Amino acid sequence: MVKKRVHELAKELKIESKEIINRLNQMGINVKSHMSTLEDGVVERLHQLYRPDQEEVKPAAAKPPAAGQTIKPEEVAPQAQPESRKKDAAMLDSQKPDRDRVQKNGRERAGKATRADHYKGAGLVERVPSRPPDRRFQERPKQSDKARPWGQPRADQGARLKTADFVQERTRSARAGQDYSQPEKVQQERVQDRQQKERPPFEKAQQPRPQHEHKPQDSVKERPHPERASREADNAKRAERLDKGAGKTAEIAYKSGLKALEKAQVGTKPQRAGERGARPGGLHETKPKKNLAPGDAGYAKLWQEQTPVIPQKLLDDRRRQTEEKVKVTEKQKQQAKSQKLVKSREKRNAMAELAEERLRPRPAVAGSRKKGAAKPQEQAQKPAQPLEKKPIVLGESTTVQELALKMHKSPAELIKKLMQLGVMATINQEIDTDTATILAGEFGYEVEVKLPVDIEAMLMQEPEDDPVSLQDRPCVVTVMGHVDHGKTSLLDAIRETNVTATEAGGITQHIGAYQVEHNGKKITFLDTPGHEAFTAMRARGARVTDIAILVVAADDGVMPQTVEAINHAKEAKVPIIVAINKIDKPGANPDRVKQQLTEHGLVAEEWGGDTICVNVSALKKEGLKDLLEMILLVAEMSELKANPNRPARGTVIEAELDKGRGPVANVLVQNGTLNVGDTLIAGAAFGRVRAMMDDKGRRIKKAGPSTPVEVLGFSEVPQAGDIFVVVEDEKLARTIVARRQARKREEELKSTARVSLADLFKHIQEGQIKELGIIIKADVQGSVEALRQALERLSTDEVRVNIIHGGVGAITETDVMLASASNAIIIGFNVRPDVNARKAAENEKVDVRLYRVIYDAIEDVKAAMSGLLEPEYREVTLGRAEIRKIFRSSKIGNIAGCYVLEGKIERDASVRVIRDGIVVHEGKLESLKRFKDDVREVVQGYECGIALEKFNEIQEGDIIEAFTVEAIKRQLT
């Protein structure tokens, strides 16, 4: 026979697998899961346990009921009892010796044996003789709980308890004559303990199956169940929670049944609280007043007389009413649950409509409020009217959810439409303005794009001032010209200082800002470098100036940087005053200078033009007053005004990193007033003004328009030429600077082009170009910028300059390590390396070059780049020889006997063989001999023997030409 699994047996018995597993564990059979297999004997025992009706015997003649049996009203007289009932009394008597033997071993085990003998039946003795305790479960099937209302006690519980009391009483009477008889109090306590405490595992295996798995069978009597009281109590509590009305009805019926039974009972005491009660309309088994055994005469008659009979129709009616009420309660619960779901859904819809109503722009209210009576009708008609599709206002970018709210559509519709358009998007994904416009057009909406207000753009846009608040301001004058034409010397003469003597090489390499006073009016001078490397500085000076002074040496005339300065001034649209300097020199010719200026569009006033020309001598201080008068005249004609009562705005002229003071910026205030404590922004740097110094080094607390000052307090060194603006607070400054830095990073990432397959060969070719890596450190930002531009102009197609890093301040150890890693040199301009940097440079063998004059640095870099250039190769012919005789040797090969026609033939030279004007071979000499001696060279007019490497096909009359290749170094132009 095939072994059955637990779940197959459960399906066959129509019960749960878990219940079978629990029952098998109680019987002492270990089962792990529902897939475990069972032996045939175990399956048969479970069949007998859960289907005892299959082993029923045929009914015999009616007999008196045995102890422990329950007699239903409809089965008392008319039906015949099974033959197994006949043996109950005999079995009780036959088991008395066993009980006595067990009682000698222990009182508690005696009580258990008594109860086990009482519950034994004759139904399964023949089938399972090996486990007698299980036989009491096979006696007869139990009645299903479906036949009674939920929560009501069973009708046979009281009878079962009374039968147990009868058995105990019978046992005590049988033991009355023994020495080890137990008091009645101890026996009662033991009965209560057996009813309340949990059974040991052996007795747990004998517990009956659940009552709800089998249909009720009227032909079989119910057997007692010791643990049903607790389960029935739980069912009663559950029934009370489900329906109070049904519970009250059941309680009334239960109490009425108890009263009827108490009146009908003879010789029994009333039911106490805590004991198992009877089912409404059920039976109470009564304990006979007389001590009659089941086999005694008159026992059955007394039993039937004391058992009241309740009509079955009354029980069925009460059961039907209770079941209907339970069904009504379940139906009400389902209705309440569905109503709750509907209310929650309506609430969510109302909240969504309220949110859309708040986002929707409200139309203007027209007319009076007297038309309020017609509002409900208008609202009822609103859904029928088509919605007016107003233009959707969008910003720079929007999410799908925001666009759906504005269009009164669900996000799913928009996502579906985007998928149709080939765009995969989520509900929170941002889409650009173009995509949003196309998507809105698909639904018939127009789009208006309104970009958000850019705070940075508003700050950079200079507002218009009220003409009443404008005041006169000093003019800003920029001195421009060629190098060594005397710009700084002229300013020294005006300021009565000696700045030129303190500058390296006698040339200006920074923008200097000064302020002088003449005739009670202030003039601000900006001194720009004249060297060609400082083009950016000159252009920056021309942008911030009001008047440009073009200094031209009378002996040199117009030079390249002079022309560049003229172009900067014209581009900035500022008036130009020409100062012809060095008129005291012997070779001075001012007229020639004026003639040259006319070639560039500057015509002197005395020649009918509008350009003011002043002859000055900075060395002898001649013509300075005339120059200042002309400056004030042009400024007065220009009507220079500014508003000092507003936040300051200006330009960063120069910036540097001071070791003791940190980032320092020379700024020119162009409008407003700059105060100590103001928060300002300059490019990617921001800060609070901690201190200000004027051009003479004095601390000041405020600086008005056209005032050059030195500002301390920046977070980092700003770029020269940046516009600085005073803002309200530091928080706003940080926000704007963060945006600028993020924008700068994005631009750098965009500028980094990706290498494609088509450009791969191009990049390979570029890899063959030699590079000279340079790290620039200078004292001011302007010098770094000038050096960078000057060195980058030296790059050619074969060698180029790679500026790895440029910064302001002293040379540090970090710069040295960067140069070592990138194989670069360090150029320091007006700065020195610290101690650690010098030691690191020696250890890493990094070349550090220090300069104070910019053109010295440019010349050295040019020489270094020239050394990287590939040299040019040139061929030099040494001599020619004619082959007149051929000598053949087995070891060497053919030897040419030659006569040197011109020049000389050297042994290490390269040769080529020419036959009839055609080169037939080019190679090296293997040997050169004169007679039998090896020689280094043979000059013109002598004979020699020549052997060629790897070439023997020589002929008489061939010409051997000797030559060498020379390498010629190249220079950068």
From Swiss-Prot:
Residues 527-530 are annotated as: G3. Residues 581-584 are annotated as: G4. Residues 481-488 are annotated as: G1. This is Translation initiation factor IF-2. Residues 472-641 form the tr-type G domain. GTP binds at residues 481-488, 527-531, 581-584. Keywords: Cytoplasm, GTP-binding, Initiation factor, Nucleotide-binding, Protein biosynthesis. GO terms for molecular function: GTP binding; GTPase activity; translation initiation factor activity.
